[in-house]
Amino acid sequence: MGTIISNKTPQETLRLINNIPFFKSFSSAEKQEFAELSNQVIEYSDKTAIVEEGQTDMAVFILLKGEAIVTRNDLPKVTINTLTIGALFGEVSFLTQTPRTTNIFAKSRAKVLKLDHKMFEKLKPETREKLKDNFINVLVNRMSDMNTALVRLKVEMEAISQAAVDYQEEFDRILK
């Protein structure tokens, strides 16, 4: 479990937000509105779970310091992804109100900004929509990355399959 560092002042939160690419498209007024709402900065030690698969906590997180790794319970030794400063995670559960589908562990000492639904409900509708649009952009980019990886994997699998056929044909030729 992480340690809550503090509830940051609006000025401290604004400084953090200004350094995060996710918030680059927001105006100064929108960033200020966001910074004035309650949020938490939480620190996690090395190898500590930030998010656990199956959890029903519906917050979204932004990595402020350190690195984190993504895993799944069915593949515990496989690192699906490594998250770096500025990474957004937890947005799927936040948007769909469904349990977490992955684990996120601090790879090193990490700080995250945790944002919950109560905070989002206090935002002006335009700011809230912009946040949702940014979430969608993150999801679209991830989907594009997954499609690229899937195509690469398919090409590799076809090459392996063809190599197996070629090998079998050569093996059969030698045995004749």
Protein language model regions, located:
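Cytosolic regulatory regions built on CNB/CRP/Popeye-like sensor folds
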Residues: M1-K176
